[in-house]
A protein has these predicted regions:
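Basic nucleic-acid-binding interfaces
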Residues: 1-148
C-alpha cells in the first residue's frame, strides 16, 4: 500500500482520520533470533494482527533483533494497546511454533520491555521511509521486508 497523502483520510462510521505511528520494538537482550523461518512467521503474525485491528502497514522491516513499522491506525487503538497485542500474540505464537526460542528465552519473554513510538507528524513519512529503505538492501517489491 502506498503512503497516504494528507487528502487520503480513512473513514469510520462516525469518524474521518489519519493517524500514523512509527513503532520500533526489540528482542529481549537484543538477541539475533528474528532470522529465517522465525522472521517470516513473525511478519505473517504481525500482518494478521494488524488486519484484525484494521491497521494498515505502510512500511515495515523485520531485522535480526528488532522490528520497525509505519502504520495507519483507527482512532480506537492506542499505541500501547497496539503494541500489547502485537508483542503479546507474536511472542505466544512464536514460542509455540519454535520451541528452540524457549531455550533462549527461558523466562518466556521474547520482547524487551517497552517500545519506541512516534507519530508521523513528528517524523515525516519521507524521513521514516528513507530510513527503512536504506536500513538494508531491499530485495522485493513487498512493503514489509525481512532483513537478510
Amino acid at each position: 500500500m502506498p503512503f497516504l497523502s494528507s487528502m487520503d483520510y480513512r473513514k469510520g462510521p462516525h469518524t474521518k482520520y489519519l493517524i500514523e505511528y512509527h513503532f520500533v520494538w526489540v528482542t529481549k537482550y537484543r538477541y539475533h533470533v528474528l532470522k529465517g523461518d522465525v522472521a517470516l512467521r513473525l511478519r505473517e503474525l504481525v500482518r494478521q494482527s494488524c488486519e484484525m485491528m484494521e491497521i494498515h502497514i505502510l512500511r515495515g522491516v523485520v531485522s535480526k533483533d528488532h522490528v520497525h513499522m509505519l502504520v495507519s491506525a483507527p482512532p480506537q487503538w492506542s499505541p500501547s494497546e497496539i503494541m500489547r497485542r502485537l508483542k503479546g500474540r507474536s511472542a505466544r505464537k512464536l514460542f509455540e511454533e519454535f520451541p528452540r526460542l524457549k531455550k533462549r528465552y527461558w523466562g518466556r519473554h521474547l520482547w524487551a520491555r517497552g517500545y519506541f513510538c512516534v507519530t508521523s507528524g513528528s517524523l515525516t513519512q519521507e524521513m521514516v521511509a528513507q530510513y527503512l529503505e536504506h536500513h538494508f538492501e531491499r530485495r522485493s517489491d513487498d512493503q514489509f521486508d525481512v532483513e537478510p
